[in-house]
Amino acid sequence: MSEIAVRNWLNAMSESIARRDLAAHMALVSRKVQVYGLPGDRVVDYDGWHQRRRNELRRGLLASLSYDDLAMRQITLRRVRFNVNETMTAATGACVIINKDVILEQEDGEHWRVVEENIRHWEHGKQQTRNVG
């Protein structure tokens, strides 16, 4: 997997939220996913991720996901590890910037899905002034 393919995966994540397409979004997430680094040492699995995104999309809470500062860390035949800043923008315009390490794995011989995220740092960003609805 090249950096271009990682960028395509990140774009697909963003587009799935912009289209409010939960099925397309979850197709990018492995059923064995684990998210670490949350408050209280909680770990989020596939069901937790699905429940949260379903709630955010049904209630119109999450307006967009965007990514920047991509740094490739390791590439193997079936796995790639990278660091990225993810900006989650709410429908209210509030945003959270999350720095995280991400591991994608090729599943089913062709589909790249996230299998692990390690949240390193997050901060509340400035209120977005553009129309995000």
Protein language model features and the residues they cover:
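A short gly/proline-enriched turn/hairpin at secondary-structure junctions
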Residues: Q34-V44, R58-G60
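Surface-exposed, charged secondary-structure patches
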Residues: H50-I97
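Short, low-complexity N-terminal intrinsically disordered segments enriched in polar/charged residues
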Residues: M1-K32, V43, D47, K126, ...
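A mature extracytoplasmic/lumenal domain signature
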Residues: V29, P39, A71, E86-M88, ...
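Hydrophobic alpha-helical core bundles mediating ligand binding, dimerization, or RNAP-core interactions
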Residues: L10-M13, I17, V29, V33, ...
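Short beta-strand edge/turn micro-motifs at domain boundaries
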Residues: C95-G133
